[in-house]
Amino acid sequence: MRKVLVIDTSVLCVWLKVPGKETCGPSNALVTYEKVSEKIEEEKKKGTTFILPLATIIETENHIAHSSGDRMSLGEEFAQIMIDSADEKSPWAAFTEQSSLWNPENLKKLAEKWKITVIGGQALGDASIVEVVKYYTDLGYEVEIFTGDEGLKAYEPTVEIPRRRRK
């Protein structure tokens, strides 16, 4: 089964070293630049396809635009990731694969779902990432959400482990 890695804002900001966003996740499982880089390289070697959701693009650019760091360098590095995704340059999936999620019918469905999940504190960005995860799961991919957000990680589909037959 082919695997996709859906990259969330929290992890992307750590990977880009956005000032103030150098780590993410709970204190007992802190996600650092070293852990992110190691995971990215490991998944590249496995042939995993990386997914850049629209919410991740919008949220990450906002953190970069409001950072106290070198916005020019951060912007250039992030722009290259966006271009690689748009061009489907390995390991990135083509951004256009997600375009059906943003048609009028699916946007209305997202709005209906979100107005219920917002009561529990789910942001619209996370709700849209959940839809990206569902999209790739329905296509038969093994999907991992690479995030420091335990709430979002909870939406990751479980992978069935084959059981040994008894003799």
Tell me the role of every PLM-derived stretch.
Residues 23-24, 34-35, 39-45, 87-90, ...:
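Alpha-helix termini
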Residues 1-4, 118, 122, 130-167:
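Acidic, PIN/NYN-like endoribonuclease modules and their adjacent C-terminal/linker elements
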Residues 70-87:
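Helix-adjacent hinge/juxtasegments
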